Design a protein with these regions (language model features):
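Beta-lactam-recognizing serine transpeptidase/beta-lactamase-like catalytic domain environment
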Residues: 70-72, 78, 299-316, 325, ...
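Long, low-complexity, intrinsically disordered segments
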Residues: 716-767
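Membrane-proximal periplasmic segments of bacterial cell-envelope enzymes
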Residues: 1-314, 350-359, 699, 708, ...
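Intrinsically disordered, low-complexity mixed-charge segments
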Residues: 677-718
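Structural motif corresponding to the C-terminal cap of alpha-helices
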Residues: 336-348, 426, 599
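Ligand-site clamp/hinge motif
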Residues: 654-657
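Solvent-exposed, polar/charged alpha-helical surfaces in well-ordered, non-transmembrane soluble domains
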Residues: 90-101, 209, 213, 238-242, ...
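Amphipathic, well-packed alpha-helical segments that form the structural scaffold of globular domains
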Residues: 286, 290-293, 303-304, 334-342, ...
């Protein structure tokens, strides 16, 4: 390159550098201008963000048995949730149609509580509410009020308003109804930038996968993990545990007598779509089980861009509620109750009304805690929703909590209460006698009877309890009057609340204020007939009070409240004395002596059981007759054992069970299960049965031969039978005319009826 060429290149380089410097200078000047002149404006814009807080539902606390085994727990489920912040400008109704189609394809439904069905062929709509449902009627009224419609508005009026309000005119009638229902739900849940909309709940994993596959087409549609209630041991006291459910319209919006509207659950932090306890222990301990919800915060800038998502408050799970019940013992009592009813039907009720239902309650004598509360028949908690129609239409009433709400005439189980009253009041002592010749002749036109089974002549209180002498208690009851023996019966736990945490029937005793009262009614009520009705849990409480020499503890199901994370005991149920009969002299010892001798009068296992049992049978009449003057009978029993150092008390009722003595083997089976619980063998047996069941299920899963599967099931069940709990049904001794229980007195025209309108022996709960 010559010199001229070099000079040309140099000049060009200088020019290029100069241009670059000018451009750089212009950029620097612009940056200085932006930073110094408009810096505050840009800073404000950069920091102009908005936080949106969303609730993260806390897991519900577990319910466990006395050994810590889970009964009710929380499992993961999946909800389809719409987040308005993330939806952008996508057409909402088009997106809703797509979600509905995806849900339908996977057999799923979506939330729709609009009480209007699809249009008929003429294009008309009709309400689908239940005329008898208060909740439905309130929801309809609230819906019409919210839409600005009169209460006489028709379903067509409501749909017309919803279609117009939500711009659904261009959709087919079918889609108008679907989308109107979803929009209605959105309004109910207050769908907004700060409130997500739960469109579908508890969807399958297949539906989850399908929706996630279409996530790019569905902005703002999220799959949210949430908690669902499930029951690991769904057969354990389902009627006592109760249920959880969605918040109803009448609980969410409360209108008082002055027309003032309040939202008490919202004030407590609930959202309308939340689940809460609606019955039983799930409801009573809602505050403990519920937990504290967390908060998720989404931050969006002024351009609508999500710049941050974080969990600002971690949800805290609810506390654990620990029961006094051991699930293995409860299951054992359930089984022996069913076995006893089966035995009664096979051995005794072969040609008469079958025993179809019953209840047993077992208490810890020392503190009133419930060890078992069995109902037969019962139901599976996990199948409640799916089988509700079947359960509710079953004439044997499996949903009915007989143990706590069944009311039964106690029959002769009431006699120890009369004995306590007579002894403690000084009316009689251990040497006092009443002459029994089989007929009570005090009244001119009323002569109730006694079978004199095992006794006659002069009878003292111990012998009267042993042989259930009606004449003795007729006379003592007449002399005491119902005013006196009722006062003692109340203190012993009959005809009043036991104190359990959940709903129970109160029952009643026969009183002088009864509309059918006459002096002879005191005589009938003294043997547990008349108008008196009590529940099985009252019978068990009564037996425990007799065992405790007159001290009655509050009956309870809950042992403690525990911290879910640490297991720390937050609160514990202490023994609470509800009432005391001081018991002058040897009142309770004499009653105990009589009750200890009752087993010797009963055929079957109880008469030779090595552990002394104090018990009293009852054979109350039912209103139904199987022949003129012949009433069907219930079988009743109260017991405690060991008689000289009581640990457990038992109350039993078997509908149409016949004589109370037929429950003697049931008492023994319960005792065997209790002692097996104490020595650990019951837990070992339960574990062995569980393993055998699992093995059987695995074997059945591997076999393709139905005959082999059936044979395997039979073998497995037979192997799992606990030997000590199999009633000696087929070898039971022939039933005697009285079998340890005096037959009901023969009625004549002047005798007050044992069953009246005020004294139903039906099992309906008291309101």
């Amino acid at each position: 390159m010559n010199q001229n060429e070099r000079k040309t290149v140099a000049r060009r380089m200088i020019l290029l550098i100069a241009v670059a410097c000018v451009i750089m200078g212009l950029y620097v000047m612009r940056l200085i201008f932006l930073q110094l002149v408009n810096g505050d404006d840009f800073k404000a814009k950069a920091t102009n963000t908005t936080d949106y807080n969303f609730t993260v539902t806390a897991a519900r606390g577990d319910i466990v048995d006395s050994a810590g085994r889970r009964i009710a727990t929380t499992t993961t489920s999946y909800n389809v949730v719409l987040n308005k912040l993330l939806m952008g400008d996508r057409d909402l109704d088009t997106m809703l149609q797509q979600i509905v189609e995806l849900l339908r394809a996977n057999g799923e439904s979506w939330n729709d509580t609009l009480l209007i069905g699809q249009a008929d062929a003429a294009g008309n709509y009709a309400f689908t509410d239940d005329d008898t449902s208060t909740s439905d009627q309130k929801q309809l009224a609230d819906m019409k009020e919210t839409l600005g419609l009169q209460q006489y508005a028709t379903a067509n009026d409501v749909m017309e308003m919803l279609v117009e309000k939500n711009d659904l005119q261009d959709f087919s009638p079918e889609w108008q109804r679907v989308l109107a229902g979803i929009h209605y739900e959105m309004d109910r849940q207050a769908f907004s930038n700060v409130n997500n909309f739960v469109m579908a709940e508890n969807v399958s994993t297949l539906a989850v996968a399908t929706i996630k596959e279409h996530s790019l087409q569905l902005p703002g549609v999220e799959i949210v993990e949430t908690s669902a209630r499930s029951y690991d041991q769904s057969d354990i006291i389902p009627a006592v545990l109760g249920r959880v459910g969605k918040i109803t319209a009448e609980k969410w919006k409360v209108t008082d007598s002055n027309g003032q509207v309040t939202y008490p659950l919202r004030e407590k932090g609930y959202n309308m779509n939340d689940v809460l306890g609606i019955s039983g222990l799930e409801s009573v301990y809602e505050d403990e089980l519920r937990g504290k919800d967390g908060v998720k915060t989404i931050t969006r800038n002024s351009d609508g861009v999500i710049v941050d998502t974080k969990l600002t408050t971690v949800p805290e799970p609810g506390h654990t509620v620990q029961l006094t019940i051991d699930s293995n013992f409860q299951r054992a009592v359930d089984k022996v109750l069913a076995d006893n009813i089966d035995m009664i039907n096979r051995v005794y009720n072969t040609g008469t009304m079958k025993a179809a239902a019953g209840a047993v309650v077992v208490l810890d004598v020392k503190d009133g805690s419930v060890l078992a509360a069995s109902n037969y028949p019962s139901y599976d908690q996990n199948l409640y929703a799916a089988n509700y129609s079947e359960y509710s239409s079953d004439p044997s009433l499996p949903l009915f909590n007989r143990a706590l709400q069944g009311l039964y005439t106690p029959g002769s189980t009431f006699k120890p209460a009369v004995a306590v009253a007579a002894l403690d009041s000084g009316l009689i002592n251990q040497y006092s006698t009443v002459y029994c010749n089989g007929v009570y002749n005090y009244f001119k036109d009323y002569h109730p009877r006694c079978t004199r089974h095992g006794h006659s002549g002069n009878i003292d209180v111990v012998t009267a309890i042993k042989w259930s002498c009606n004449i003795f208690f007729y006379d003592v009851g007449r002399r005491l009057t119902s005013d006196v023996y009722d006062a003692y019966a109340y203190k012993l736990g009959l005809g009043q609340r036991t104190g359990v945490e959940v709903s129970e029937a109160v029952g009643r005793l026969t009183t002088k204020s009864d509309s059918n009262y006459m002096a002879s009614l005191d005589v009938q009520a003294a043997i547990g007939q008349g108008n008196t009705v009590v529940s099985p849990i009252q019978l068990a409480t009564y037996a425990a009070t007799l065992a405790n020499n007159g001290t009655r503890y509050r009956t309870h199901f809950v042992k403690a409240i525990l911290d879910t994370n640490t297991g720390e005991v937050l609160s514990e149920t202490k023994p609470e004395v509800m009432d005391v009969i001081e018991g002058t002299g040897n009142t309770f010892e004499l009653v105990r002596q009589g009750m200890k001798q009752v087993p010797s009068t009963i055929s079957g296992k109880i008469s030779s059981y090595p552990v002394p049992i104090a018990c009293k049978t009852g054979t109350p009449q039912r209103s139904e007759t199987y022949a003129p003057g012949k009433h069907y009978l219930n079988a009743m029993m109260v017991a405690y054992l060991p008689a000289d150092d009581p640990q457990i008390a038992i109350g039993i009722s078997i509908e149409y069970g016949g004589y109370g003595a037929r429950t003697g083997d049931l008492v023994v089976d319960i005792a065997n299960a209790y002692f097996a619980l104490k020595d650990g063998s019951l837990a070992q047996q339960a574990e062995a049965e569980k393993e055998a069941e699992q093995t059987q299920q695995e074997d059945q899963a591997q076999t393709t031969d139905p005959a082999q599967a059936a044979a395997g099931q039979t073998t497995g069940n037979a192997a799992a039978q606990p030997a000590q709990m199999t009633p000696a049904a087929d070898t039971a001794a022939p039933e005697t005319a009285a079998e340890g229980e005096a037959q009901p007195a023969v009625q004549d025209e002047q005798q007050p009826a044992a069953d009246t309108e005020q004294n139903p022996d039906a099992i309906a709960p008291e309101n």
